[in-house]
Regions:
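Small/polar glycine-rich anion-binding or flexible loop at a beta-alpha turn
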Residues: 530-540, 602-605
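Functionally critical, mid-to-C-terminal surface segments that flank or help form catalytic/ligand
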Residues: 471-531
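N-terminal chloroplast transit peptides
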Residues: 1-71, 80
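N-terminal organelle-targeting presequences
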Residues: 62-154, 175-176, 183-185, 601, ...
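Active-site pocket-lining segments that scaffold enzyme catalytic pockets across diverse folds
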Residues: 308-401, 445-448, 452, 459, ...
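Non-catalytic accessory segments adjacent to catalytic cores
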Residues: 43, 47-48, 54-55, 69-73, ...
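Cytosolic ligand/metal-binding cores
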Residues: 90-110, 132-138, 203-209, 268-305, ...
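Glycine-rich, N-terminal phosphate-binding loop and its surrounding beta-alpha-beta segment
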Residues: 156-253
């Protein structure tokens, strides 16, 4: 239990039956010491006011299912499911049935819901399948484009997920035989349409563990996936450091958490798809009839309509703001890191330190409404939301790709160095040139790019880096960026790609283990899924972003916003503190009615190339 465990009520009770399937993370004496207020950076005790507050991230749960005005914070209904990562599941081979079925197209979502309910009722009325395990996706095309976020906003079921691919990047190097643009958008030869955004609720099967994500866990997920059913996907996230203790706010996520949604809305370029997925496995004590019954229950709760979202702001103001660490503690931690970087033994080359900021607002923040606001200025970023049953929501707007795999083709990128956008075009150009020519920023960026290149070369053939250095311009910030492509030798190398690329020097440091140990020693909060892999596994392809520019929201007036900065030789602690503010500004802007010192500009995919 770390310092931020006070954000959740210590009387936290399991009200949701789904939570009975999940084991809480252990609490060690070291983590308890952190919760009592020991600041690793200063060696001193934190003042009580920094540990406790009357503000509650999770208020007492209602005793009955009620809907509040405007549909906000209605008590969600939780679907029962099976944990596909039971011991030995990864050794059992593929499930017996992996199938996708398409029903006739519908003119509107309301008609699609009716078709799915009828199809699942027919499954329940028929004879049980003889197959002891399987997964079936049933989908209804809709002849109009719907908004996946607005569909999700109308739903009350948990768990839920959302993932939106970013706009394609130009100038990504191509490999022979590649038909992917490296952003999960596929190519011209795809025989299925790639979703622009996917929203899902319920879990046909979930995958959760408290040990680090392993090859056996990856195989347990892949049992349910198939090239022939490319849109059956497992969406979720992995902890930044699964060997560290999870604090209370992150306990329900385990060390990793993925779901194949029971009901899913796919937003396409010109149309939509509403789909439902049923999964069963007798060996996991989840029979066909269990799965049918639970899916029928979830479908009865699905709203056939969408709910409009105000995407301009959240109509809420900040009442208080506290940072962990404080500015003084941050300066001491950065100074200690610089001592190790410049020391005789050169124990560190780079370390990335992070900050967790607690915002208390005058009203509750709906995670889906926050997601919608982030998406407005996030065309060059991945938007995501993961929320297990009875847990806070992890929401983000990440510009950074960890990797994308399509068949044997891999794409990745290096992203480091940060500057604000300029108030005018001329000012913006000048700031960008300063970033390109900065020796300190070039050192940080080169460390990241060269490390990722070497990691890919260990597993892949044909590693290509182009451009080697360019500007990535986002609405509020700009970064140095490089694009990488490679080719794995077989699809089973996907786990090695994930395991090798995470954590990258962009979010951890170099050497990896030394940087990770420094973070364990000097960060006094739990990163949880922040800076970890966030994305999806599929049969034909998979894609993961790095879970940065993210926040954790529970049912209450408190929100945790995470940001990090790279520390290398030449770093100025105060400049890096300002960089944290800059990276968190997309959240701060939405939590206030206006932000005076941040300039908003339209995102551009690429700027000057070197």
């Amino acid at each position: 239990m770390r310092i931020f465990s006070y954000l959740f009520s210590v009387t936290h009770q399991t009200a949701c039956p789904c939570a009975l399937l999940l084991s809480p993370a252990s609490v060690t004496s070291r983590s308890l010491a952190r919760a009592r207020g020991h600041d690793a950076a200063t060696g001193a005790s934190m003042p009580p006011s920094s540990l406790y507050s009357s503000g509650r991230l999770l208020p007492a749960r209602p005793t009955s299912s009620t809907t509040t005005t405007a549909g906000r914070w209605a008590r969600p209904s939780c679907s029962l499911s099976m944990n596909g990562c039971a011991p030995g599941a990864g050794d059992r081979g593929a499930v017996c049935v992996r199938e996708a079925r398409a029903l006739p197209a519908a003119s509107a979502p309301q008609d699609a819901v009716g078709q799915l309910r009828a199809a699942v009722d027919a499954l329940g009325a028929g004879a049980p399948t003889a197959a002891p395990s399987g997964i079936i996706r049933i989908e209804v095309p809709i002849r109009q484009r719907g908004d996946a976020i607005e569909w999700l906003h109308a739903q009350s079921a948990l768990p839920r997920c959302f993932f939106s691919a970013r706009a394609p990047l130009p100038e990504r190097p191509a490999l022979a035989g590649s038909s992917s643009d490296g952003n999960g958008n596929g190519g011209l030869n795809d025989h299925w349409q790639q979703p622009v955004s996917v929203a899902g609720v319920g879990s046909a099967v979930f995958f959760r563990g408290t040990n680090p994500f392993s090859l056996a866990d990856w195989r347990a997920i892949k049992r349910f996936l198939s090239r022939d059913c490319p849109l059956i996907r497992a969406y979720g996230a992995i902890r930044f450091d699964a060997t560290s203790d999870a604090s209370v706010e992150w306990e329900d996520y385990g060390s990793f958490y993925f779901i194949v949604p029971q009901v899913e809305f796919n937003e396409l370029e010109e149309s939509s798809v509403l789909a439902t997925t049923i999964a069963w496995d007798d060996s996991l004590s989840w029979t066909w009839q269990n799965a049918v019954n639970e899916l029928q229950s979830t479908l009865e709760k699905i709203s056939p309509c969408s709910v409009k979202v105000d995407k301009s702001n959240l109509q809420t103001t900040i009442m208080s703001l506290n940072h962990v660490p404080t500015k003084a503690s941050w300066d001491l931690a950065v100074t200690k890191a610089l001592q190790m970087i410049k020391g005789r033994q050169r124990e560190l080359v780079k370390v990335v330190l992070a900050r967790c900021s607690r915002y208390i607002t005058d009203s509750c923040i709906d995670p889906v409404e926050l997601l919608a606001c982030l998406k407005v200025e996030g065309q060059n970023a991945y938007q995501f939301c993961i929320q297990p049953p009875d847990a806070p929501a992890f929401v983000g707007n990440s510009p950074e790709q960890l990797f994308h795999r399509k068949y044997l083709n891999i794409s990745s990128e290096a992203l480091a160095g940060t500057r604000a956008r300029g108030k005018t075009r001329a000012d913006d150009f000048k700031i960008g040139q300063d970033l390109l020519l900065s020796g300190k920023e070039d050192m940080e960026f080169t460390i990241v790019r060269d490390s990722i290149t070497k990691k890919l070369q260990m597993i892949c053939d044909e590693v290509v880096v182009h451009p080697r250095k360019a500007l990535r311009k986002l609405p509020r910030v700009q970064h140095l960026s490089a694009q990488l492509t490679a080719r794995i030798r077989n699809e089973d190398d996907e786990f090695d790609i994930l395991n090798t690329l995470h954590p990258s020097p962009a979010v951890c440091g170099l050497p990896t283990e030394e940087a990770r140990q420094f973070i364990r020693d000097y960060e006094i909060f739990d990163r949880g899924m922040y800076a970890g892999p966030v994305g999806w596994f599929g049969g034909a392809e998979s894609e993961f972003a790095v879970g940065i520019r993210s926040a954790l929201l529970g049912k209450g007036h408190s929100t945790l916003v995470y940001a990090g900065a790279g520390i290398v030789e030449g770093t100025n602690p105060s400049f890096e503190w300002d960089e944290l503010d800059l990276k968190a500004s997309q959240f701060a802007k939405l939590l206030r009615y206006q932000e005076q010192h941040i300039c908003y500009q339209k995102a551009e995919n690429m700027g000057t190339v070197i």
